[in-house]
Design a protein with these regions (language model features):
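Cytoplasmic-side transmembrane-helix entry/capping segments in multi-pass membrane proteins
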Residues: 1, 53-63, 107-120, 136-142, ...
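Loop-to-transmembrane-helix transition segments
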Residues: 1-2, 47-73, 135-141, 193-221
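Transmembrane alpha-helical segments that form core, pore/gating elements
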Residues: 13-16, 24, 39, 132-193, ...
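Structural signature of hydrophobic alpha-helical transmembrane segments
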Residues: 20-35, 73-91, 133-146, 204-217, ...
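Hydrophobic transmembrane alpha-helices of multi-pass small-molecule transport proteins
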Residues: 110-127, 264-281
Length: 282
């Protein structure tokens, strides 16, 4: 699991480097098309026997997962890597809430306490001016909420579809969606506030292709290692260890030139990590 967290942070580091010259929308496209190729090969070798029947929920999982990933990649390119990863790691907190709201799962007192701690942590990191949050903070929070909604849908979808099909829905939308948006971007005037959603394709050059491959390989390796970890030990232990991603991201981000987080940001990160521990160990 530590290796999964490290490779995940490596992916984030190279995505951040690519984000200085390529739009996050394009990085999202390349990250997903790599995964689509791998999953299609796996399905060809061993066809699925899913019973299906929940197409729109499957599409929703792909669509919301794509938007969450896009928001995440955009933030990695524009704010410190450790902060972007911390926002994304709020997903277990929102997952506990959505599982209670949509699936009728119990919301124990520890989970309620975790939600409160997580909210305080978000406020300390975002430092809102009154009720106003920056675009980066809003997208960071959405990356956690969107991921949680995607995970919530998986709990229902796994009764109808092979895990590979569920993952393919996410990566397919995450490939086709950016492609459409990049084509549309050539025919519209892009509002600066929507630059995370619309961007013109920029042909990668030289070493950027190597970075793109690393992002794809690291993302796939991280997913495989995490899945393996869940089969070898208790989910609570694995879930707790995933928060080392924040530490790895802080280190890699600092190496890449990120500003070291201030006192309030560190406290906010600590509260979100503590909240995550409370949720995954409930």
């Amino acid at each position: 699991m530590l290796l999964a967290s490290f490779t995940f942070a490596i992916m984030g580091g190279f995505a951040k480097i690519l984000g200085q010259s390529l739009p996050p929308l394009e990085i999202t496209f390349f990250r997903n098309i790599f995964g689509v190729a791998i999953i299609l090969a796996a399905l060809f070798k061993s066809p699925t026997k899913s019973k299906g029947g929940k197409f729109w929920l499957l599409f929703f999982r792909g669509f919301i997962g794509f938007l969450a990933l896009l928001a995440y990649f955009y933030d990695m390119a524009h704010i410190p890597l450790g902060v972007a990863v911390t926002y994304n790691k709020t997903s277990p907190l929102f997952l506990a809430f959505f599982a209670w709201l949509f699936l009728g799962e119990k919301l124990p007192k520890s989970a309620i306490a975790a939600l409160i701690l997580g909210f305080i942590g978000i406020v300390l990191i975002a430092k809102p001016n009154g009720f106003s949050l920056s675009k980066y903070d809003l997208l960071g929070i959405f990356s956690g909420i969107g991921a949680a909604l995607a995970y919530t849908s998986i709990r229902e979808l796994r009764r109808y579809y092979d895990t590979r099909v569920i993952t393919l829905s996410f990566m397919s939308v995450g490939t086709i969606g950016p492609l459409i948006l990049m084509i549309v971007s050539h025919y519209i005037n892009i509002n600066p506030n929507l630059d995370f959603l619309f961007a013109k394709f920029i042909m990668p050059k030289g070493i950027e292709w190597i970075y793109i491959i690393i992002v794809g390989v690291a993302a796939t390796a991280s997913q495989l290692l995490m899945t393996k970890a869940y089969t070898l030990t208790k989910a609570g232990i694995v879930g707790t260890i995933t928060y080392t991603q924040i530490l790895f991201a802080l280190i890699i981000g600092t190496i890449l030139g990120d500003k070291y987080p201030d006192f309030y940001t560190i406290i906010g990160m600590a509260l979100i990590i503590l909240a995550g521990f409370l949720v995954v160990k409930k």
